[in-house]
Amino acid sequence: MEDTSPQAVAEKAAKDPKAAKDLKDDAAAATKSFPDHFSREGDDQMDFEGVIFSSSPVLDLSQRGLRHLGKFFKIPNLQQLHLQRNLLREIPEDFFQLLPNLTWLDLRYNKIKVLPSGIGSHKHLKTLLLERNPIKMLPVELGQVTTLTALNLRHCPLEFPPRLIVQKGLVAILTFLRICSVEKAFPGDELLPEVSAPKMGSNDLQYPVLPLPRKGSPSENSLNDPDQEKEKADFFPPMERLDLSELRKSNAASEIWPSKEEIRRFWKLRQEIVENEQVEIQEKKLLAVELPPNLKAALNVKEKKHRKPWPAVRKRSTSFKGILPNLPSGYQNTVHANRMEDTHKAALQELQEKETVLEQRRRDKRALQEWREQTQHMRTRRELSKLQPPHSNMMASKIPFATDLTDYEKMPVSPFGKVKPSGEGTAQRPIEISASPLAELEDKIKRHTQQIRTRSFLGTNPMQDIKTANQDLETTKKLQEELRKLKVEMTLNKDHPFPSFTGNLSLHPPASQPQNIFFNTKS
């Protein structure tokens, strides 16, 4: 039976590279699809052990039912490891040392309660996902992972760091863990050696949280008291873990603090941090308002030497700027009112100009319409005047038969003011009456026909042209009707001649001739 232990596989791979390559391919295929017996219920000792040879930088072991992670051998190429939705309860201590190039670790939906402290030595880890794990404390070594850019702690019952720190984000969590790491490296019963503190930037003090001071202030004479030394140790900024095995302990207080200026600077920075924290949490007071008595006594001597007199400052009058609302000045009100008035005037002027233009357009349109109507009316009157016969002829044509046409202006007048009838006119006028209507009617028809032929329709006003054509048609119909009636009358006159229209002299004596009753002036 072939030996499949890790040592045998490694020796075989060293002797036969081709066989090692086949083994790597088989192992990679095996890791991509693990059998279901890894997730058997009741087998609490089931783990995942063995050598994994894979050229791929990604390994997905999610939803495999894994309960324990055995000894992972070195996989230098692995960068992403997915272990979500398993039954893992713990991570091996040397897990992160065996995966030096790991950048992504997904441990969501497991049962992990503690992370190994070896995570602090990792140099490439960027993303750590711990969602839905019953983890309560993060290791302080996690603060040393400077490459970490994403940390998922959703639905984790964390007690350390506090919830306030977790809510502030990754930077606050790492800073808090670094501070706790420094406190763990320098316990309270030991004295801090003389070490020059590194320079701190504003980013390093972004979200620090400091422990509460202990009750009871130390006495000024007991400089080497353990509580006092621990209080002084709290003032140190976060720093990397230092190798202090070769340094000796010192009982002098001057060795604990590098200089008085640094003490003041550190205390000032901490006071600023505390003030920022007190804005959000008013009920908790993290630091005392004043310096401890021993530090105050050490700084008073130097302050007295370098103290300078304050320059005389003129006392300013009480300002009501914060009490009263910001009211605009009178000048600003005037400028604003003038500006609004100018804007209003400009708008009114523009509106008036528009109204003037519109009114002028309406006037021009009305004048043009009136001119067109007047021109059309004059043209109609001119046409009607051409069609109408003279006034005297019209009156003669409308006089009924048996009516004597007498020119009253030319008739002689008797001395008594009465008109004398002329005998010659009454004898010749019936012949003229019978001939003049037909001639006048023929003249009318000729003039109307000639006018229709000479008229030219320009097409500029179609409605007017149609109206004129209808009038011409009506006039033509009237003339035709008059001609028909005149012909009928002439026919009747030929069949029944009257003595008054013959023009012949009557055989009866003058006394028996019929007289015109309209011109009989005798009584």
Curated annotation (Swiss-Prot):
Residues 335-374, 463-494 form a coiled coil. Residues 12-26, 227-236, 372-385 have a biased composition (Basic and acidic residues). Residues 513-523 have a biased composition (Polar residues). Pfam families: LRR_8 (PF13855). InterPro entries: Leu-rich_rpt, Leu-rich_rpt_typical-subtyp, LRR_dom_sf, LRR_domain-containing. It comes from the Eukaryota. LRR repeats lie at residues 55-76, 77-98, 101-122, 124-145, 147-168. Keywords: Coiled coil, Leucine-rich repeat, Repeat. Residues 1-26, 206-236, 372-394, 503-523 are annotated as: Disordered. SMART domains: LRR_TYP. This is Leucine-rich repeat-containing protein 27. It comes from Mus musculus (Mouse).
